[in-house]
Design a protein with these regions (language model features):
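Glycan-processing catalytic domains of CAZymes
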Residues: 1-174
């Protein structure tokens, strides 16, 4: 964790990340350069946990960064793909933006169930003063990574799948 924080500090200085005028192409949130900490709170026995994530988030915030946190789909209820530790919610509240993982969780037909989840997630985020960035995706296929014989895919449906997610997130207040 210390090495990561040292690296981001050096990168920020080298590339003037904290000076929007010198680095206008970098992404900023509320006037601060944005850094994402991804994969926090999953219950799949990762080699890091909430303690390490908190150390990194606290360090990034103290260095003047805005932080987006990438979390599991079921983060709010602390079930399913998410570890059951309520400290995850405390950690989310320390961040500026929340982005749950949804890739592969639904297709165009099953999306309405998840749209309701997104609506409730946005309500929680607003109540807890955390911005919410909905993760939307155009479709998915394992074909490029696992070969053509692998037939697990989520069709793009000529863009209608992506648009359904975008419109659902906007209507929910994202």
């Amino acid at each position: 964790e210390k090495l990561l924080l040292k690296d981001i500090d050096e990168i920020a200085k080298r590339y003037s990340l904290k000076d929007h005028a010198k680095n206008p192409s970098y992404l900023y949130h509320n006037g601060k350069p944005l850094v994402t900490v991804w994969g926090v709170g999953f219950n799949d026995n990762r080699s890091y946990g909430l303690n390490e994530a908190e150390y990194i988030i606290d360090g990034l915030k103290s260095q003047g960064f805005s932080v987006m946190l990438g979390v599991p789909t079921q983060w709010r209820k602390l079930e399913g793909d998410t570890e059951s530790d309520p400290r995850l919610h405390e950690l989310i509240r320390k961040c500026d933006i929340l982005m749950p993982w949804f890739v592969g969780r639904y297709n165009e037909t099953t999306y309405p169930k998840y749209q309701k989840l997104v609506e409730e997630d946005i309500q929680w985020a607003k109540k807890n003063l955390v911005d919410y960035a909905p993760l939307v995706y155009p479709g998915f296929s394992w074909g490029n990574m696992k070969g053509k014989e692998h037939n697990s895919f989520i069709p793009r449906n000529k863009g209608s799948f992506l648009w359904k997610q975008l419109m659902g997130a906007i209507r929910a207040g994202a």
